[in-house]
Amino acid sequence: MWDPLLNEFPETVHGFRCMLAIKYLQLVENTYSPDTLGYDLIRDLISVIRARDYGETSRRYCHFHSRLEGASPAELRQPLYGSCCCPHCPRHQKTNVVKQAHVPEAHDVPDVQKP
């Protein structure tokens, strides 16, 4: 869960609680598919906990809370249909193979020589 060789131990009790909360949320995050509302909400909550400035934390929490109140429990596992613009989403890192219209397909031509 927490590796003392890789990470420093938090200096305050609040820092320790935040570290445990983030580790727990990362485990919960693994139970959701990356293209669901629940996954996005958990990522938002992790960003709320990681914010250092009180103003930034308040702004992120207000955004998170408004999204959470607007969602029913059944919607958390449903795929998102709206597109978001954040670069850290796994669904933005997928490469889509698209067939280009201007490139003709190659066809196999049978041998037409007669013996």
Curated annotation (Swiss-Prot):
Per the record, the GO terms for biological process are:
negative regulation of gene silencing by regulatory ncRNA; symbiont-mediated suppression of host innate immune response
Keywords (A to Z) from UniProt: Host cytoplasm, Host-virus interaction, Inhibition of host innate immune response by virus, Suppressor of RNA silencing, Viral immunoevasion
Q: Which Pfam families match?
A: Gemini_V2, WCCH
Matches recorded under InterPro entries: Gemini_V2, WCCH
Q: Which GO terms describe its cellular component?
A: host cell perinuclear region of cytoplasm
Q: Where in the cell is it found?
A: Host cytoplasm, Host perinuclear region
- Its chief place of residence is host cell
Q: What does this protein's UniProt record list under function?
A: Through its interaction with host SGS3, acts as a suppressor of RNA-mediated gene silencing, also known as post-transcriptional gene silencing (PTGS), a mechanism of plant viral defense that limits the accumulation of viral RNAs.
**Family, as annotated:** Belongs to the geminiviridae protein AV2/V2 family.
What is its quaternary makeup? Interacts with host SGS3.
Name the record gives this protein: Protein V2
